[in-house]
Amino acid sequence: MSTSIRNRLPGTIEEIVSDKVVSEIVINTAAGPVTSIITTGSVKRMNLKKGDTAFAIIKATEVSVEAR
């Protein structure tokens, strides 16, 4: 995969919660868990499953912060 995005965190998919339109994916990385919302169609197209190795690719202008 070739991309200009520099913030790539390798990890393992811990959880996928899907509904009809969107899915929430949690990737465990060395920096901690990263949660992403993508379309359920993309999850199916990439054949993503719990336990798969994946990269969290983060564009600096697209980061949201949520207090816990």
Q: Language model features by range: what are they?
A:
Residues 1-68:
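Non-catalytic connector elements of ABC transporters
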